[in-house]
């Protein structure tokens, strides 16, 4: 059943109908559309459009429909209705007859779909926040179990300074905490109800929109009807949140893919999140992580696509806005799936401490410690930096780590170097000295773990 037709003397071409219809994806808004319709029926009682008995009949029928949808949402796709609003109204009329035709009084699909989508976004944000915090918790637990796992930290994918696997985990906790904060901010801004704004100019019925917003669980009602039906900022914000969040997950995946590789060998992934090769029997491929990394691109594409859709639209509603849903649904589904999968990857990961330790001791990762030692002896840092660079060249020439160079060789580069230099070049010393807030010292890492556990109520 089309919700429009009196103006037309010819039926729509079937090809246009298929091109125009949105039920194949906006069926996901069925529950929100029904909930919004119940609230709207209550509002119509306050302005005398419906009697209390009529509203009761409508609400009962809508609640029955809601249970039917929850039991089998796929049934909606068997219909040839134009969109979810048409489907809900048609089903309601099937249940209550002519009374169902009164429900749309004073309401437009423009404010209706805007409300439905915001309700869906609010529910989905809560799911994302839960999954985000679950992954943060998994990272904190992994960090706590690996505080003593020393490994090389990298810049330019070159070994730079020693860190711990725990410190690496906590870096991603920080990223995820920012993702959490962005979602919470987005939720605050989208928590305003457009219902009652009509097609663009507002409703002709003196409905208390603040009361209506409260019935739907919104913090307040929107202030401008023209903006309300054309606003998709919340879609852009959520897509941006997802794009940034997926960048973080992609980096997480890339790190672990490298750590898991034969070249690094720092970790081994569980069999539960890896797959094999159809040809090479020895292979154990990090498919879960590669898919997380690969799915990042589709989320970035959804954000770019939506921005291009909106950039040239005049006020108010335009059918272009129908393009807001598929990209949003897919992007947030993808992000949610990847958050869950990242947590699963951490469940059962094995950190190979001896291999991590060996790698941390290679690559002259303690060179900065030698420079700091010279600074403590009164050598200006820039000069110390140059001296250590020369010492590293000599160590490479001899095929030795810095700490294995004889004192006489080290003193060729600076006479201030004494026997006390060797304890300073140990991995433990490298870690212990990074004791300022946010550093990699055992005390700072332990404090960061405790702080994260308190914030996450672990």
Curated annotation (Swiss-Prot):
* Pathway terms, separated by semicolons: Amino-acid biosynthesis; L-arginine biosynthesis; L-arginine from L-ornithine and carbamoyl phosphate: step 3/3
Listed EC numbers: 4.3.2.1
Q: Which UniProt keywords apply?
A: Amino-acid biosynthesis, Arginine biosynthesis, Cytoplasm, Lyase
Instruction: Spell out the disulfide connections.
Output: none
> Could you state one GO biological process linked to this protein?
L-arginine biosynthetic process
Look up keyword Repeat and say if it applies: no
GO MF term list? argininosuccinate lyase activity
Task: Name one cellular component (GO) term.
Answer: cytosol
> Where does the record locate the signal sequence feature?
none
Q: Cite the PROSITE patterns for this sequence.
A: FUMARATE_LYASES (PS00163)
Compartment annotation: Cytoplasm
HAMAP family assigned to the protein according to its UniProt record, in alphabetical order: Arg_succ_lyase
Protein family according to the UniProt entry: Belongs to the lyase 1 family. Argininosuccinate lyase subfamily.
Query: What is the protein's name according to its record?
Result: Argininosuccinate lyase
Q: Which gene encodes it?
A: argH
